[in-house]
A protein has these predicted regions:
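Short amphipathic alpha-helical interaction segments
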Residues: 37-52
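Short acidic, hydrophobic short linear motifs in intrinsically disordered regions
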Residues: 23-33
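Amphipathic alpha-helical dimerization/coiled-coil segments
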Residues: 81-127
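A short, conserved structural fragment
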Residues: 51-63
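Short alpha-helical segments that sit at the start of domains
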Residues: 1-16, 20, 77, 89-92, ...
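Short, cationic-aromatic polyanion-contact patches
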Residues: 6-9, 61-83
């Protein structure tokens, strides 16, 4: 999945799917998404577009109310998409590392221990696989 460019509305839908974390039918997306700004028909168009781009996939058949429908899940991860966007705008690994440090420094002190643990996990994974 090298180049996935999403529209603003597709990003909204992907963000909802990432946050929800479980496969959903189109009907469930319409019911559970509190801030939806799209119509039923437009959601179906977005689903087809995201499926074509490889960002989501149909993964199951689920019963919703009295009908069965395909359930979709995100294949494209949030981190993967944001990395693509950053690289697409000229960022490299060094710039992303600097941005990560700047981002961490903006956090509240009470969150610092958790952030440092996450960074240590990233470094450990890099040392293992890098």
């Amino acid at each position: 999945m090298d180049r996935v460019s999403l529209t603003k509305r597709e990003e909204e839908l992907m963000s909802f799917l990432w946050d929800f974390g479980e496969p959903l039918t189109v009907r469930a997306m319409l019911d559970f998404c509190p801030k939806r700004t799209w119509s039923d028909n437009y959601l179906n168009v977005m689903i087809r577009s995201l499926e074509k781009k490889g960002a989501i996939e149909a993964c199951d058949m689920m019963r919703y109310s009295r009908q069965y429908a395909r359930a979709f899940r995100a294949v494209l991860g949030r981190e993967e998409y944001y990395i693509y966007m950053a690289v697409n705008h000229g960022a490299d690994a060094a710039l992303l590392a600097q941005a990560a440090v700047a981002f961490v420094l903006r956090e509240k002190p009470e969150n610092m221990d958790q952030l440092l643990q996450e960074l240590e996990k990233v470094l450990e994974e890099y040392r293992k696989n890098g």
